[in-house]
Amino acid sequence: MTDDFPAAPAGAARDPQTELLHPVTPVQPGFESFSVPTARASTVIFPDLASMRALDWRSDAQWRYGLHATPTSVALQQRIAAIEGGRYALLQPSGLSAISNVYFAFVKAGDDVLVPDNVYSPNREHGDWLAQDFGITVRYYDPMVGSGMAALLRPNTRLIWLEAPGSITMEVPDVPAITALARERGIVTALDNTYSAGLVFKPFEHGVDISVQALTKYQSGGSDVLMGATITADHDLYLAMKRARMRVGLGVSADDCSLVLRGLPSMQVRYRAHERSALAIAGWLKRRPEVAAVLHPAFEDCPGHAYWKRDFTGAGGLFSVVFDPRYTSAQVDAFVEGLELFALGWSWGGAHSIAMPYDIAAMRTAGMWPHRGVLVRFYIGLEHEADLRADIERSLTRHLR
């Protein structure tokens, strides 16, 4: 490669202020790198008025406005869709905004929505808000209902949510049974697939219409980006979500897209590392006398394990522990706060381990929670497994005697 870059062409002298705004900067051709360029834009420049006036919002072959798409965001959308096994993806500012995109695209006043009782709590709060203020009926169902879903369907049911597994209590639903019933009746199904990151569960192979993910988690991997995605294999569903996204004004920054793109090449390696450590630590905790139950999809006694074994090719870094009922909430809180290598905080999917206690009985409305002990969800990060196990053991010994 030559070091002789082409010189800027000579032209009429212009004021420096104008030159700063309208530079002529030839670039040496042939540059390539592993990174997708970061294209920041609000205004998108059109070559002529005819091109501007010919815009069709349904077309993905035309650039419109930086809020809607840039080369950087499109590159990320394409990669997310490919990993998931879909054809179309839309990026949202957060996982919750991706959930909102589905609601706004497919539900209106007078419609009925079914949501699993183990759903991600912001989705529950979103549904309750829509029910209270927008005239939509939202009902919660037992996540293990399977083909029993048929008895719950109404003529105005428009949307069924699924979560596989439940991100706190780890039940794995019979996804194909539910999606088959929905498809027979023209009901849209949307599944929160954040747990699998599109790696170990392929929703479109099991009849799901729309997959929703929080790219905040495994895709980013750094605990420093907020982003979500809606993915589908159906063009009409894609256009409905695209239209709703544009009307609400949802968009993502090119810089955030670049950060997520940077995390994708290592995602599967990280995912498997989380999985190995989580399985080992969950198995060890299962043998501890302080523990009444370990909720991990790979364990035979986890609700829906047979469906996980049939439909999944792995597990992530999440699992939950139900402590023996003899321990009070205060004691379990002290155990969690006594952990040195586990942070307290929302979200997961990054390099650092996290532990959070939950009052599941207070969160359920569709049925009775079968356990009496306090539940703690563990997210196993990339710290060495032996150090994490030693940290848990120290806090167990100190606080749960």
Describe each region flagged by the PLM.
Residues 25-27, 40-47, 195, 217, ...:
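Glycine-rich beta-alpha junction loops
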Residues 1-4, 87, 128, 137-139, ...:
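PLP-dependent enzyme catalytic core of the Aspartate aminotransferase-like
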Residues 60, 225-227, 314-318, 373-377:
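Short, solvent-exposed beta-strand edge segments and adjacent coil->beta transition regions
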Residues 2-70, 78, 376:
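N-terminal "arm"/small-domain region of PLP-dependent enzymes with the aminotransferase-like
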Residues 2-11, 17-26, 88-288, 295:
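Conserved PLP-enzyme active-site core in the AAT-like
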Residues 48-97, 122-129:
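Conserved N-terminal alpha-helix of the aminotransferase class I/II PLP-enzyme fold
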Residues 279-340, 344-349, 360-370:
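Conserved small-domain helix->loop->beta segment predominantly found in fold-type I
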Residues 260-269, 316-325, 377-381:
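Short, well-ordered beta-strand elements within core beta-sheets of diverse protein domains
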